[in-house]
Amino acid sequence: MTMTTDPATVDCTPSPLVRVRRKPGRARYDMAAVHAVLDAAPFSHVATVRNGRPVVLPMAHGRLDGSLVLHGSHAAGLFRDAAAGSPVCITATLLDGLVLGRSARNHSMNYRSVTIHGHATAITEPDEVIAGLQAVVEHLIRGRWQQVRKPSTAEIRETALWRVPLAQASAKTRSGSTLDPDDDRCLPVWAGHIPARLVFGQPIAADGLPPGIEPPDYLRLLPTAPAAPPPVSSSRR
């Protein structure tokens, strides 16, 4: 993805701020685990406190030099909060499946998640803005940066990018089936887990696209759903 350091060489130290207390056996604090979730998650949710009230917004992100890069507008209240020194909490979550237990209490989900605590710092140097924007674009669609027009000097000035170090981060995952107690295993209720994943539909061309411009090959790397079977026709006798 957009990493420039070896994830095996940098680990998160689990401070009390990020240490997982509920189901701690599902937690990981190494950078490889944190990076893997961030790279797979299409976007993240960023939380801050504004006028004494919590605010959470979804944002596009990328990874660069041990930091998470966030892309938004200079006018966004979230970035004004960050400029004023407000700490941020960032989460990214992937739904991997539904877990159906035999009792109402034992329903759950399989997931991969990351939580990050820190402060956001504005990226202002033109070269760093370009590198940060490349990280965000390549996270969205790998291979896209090489094909599109690069930002102009004016666009670089107008682009709002912020970085949050990954020094305080934790990953947490759940996989597998239901954990029903032995007493429930005899109940006549279906139990198990249903895998889930994000899939994409067929590309739809923008209005005004000149004839002959086909979808790029890298779009074929996106996961797609299996084609639906043709409808079964019936005839009345």
List each language-model region with its residue ranges.
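An N-terminal domain-cap segment
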Residues: 14-69, 80
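Short N-terminal helix-initiation segments at or just after the protein's N-terminus
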Residues: 4-10, 32-35, 53-67, 99-113
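N-terminal short leaders/motifs
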Residues: 1-21, 63-75, 111-120
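C-terminal edge-of-domain segments
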Residues: 1-17, 124, 128-237
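A generic structural signal for short beta-strands and their flanking turns/coil linkers
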Residues: 42, 57, 64-66, 84-88, ...
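Short, structured beta-strand-loop surface elements
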Residues: 74-135
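Short beta-strand segments in beta-sandwich/barrel cores
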Residues: 44-46, 68, 120-121, 169-172
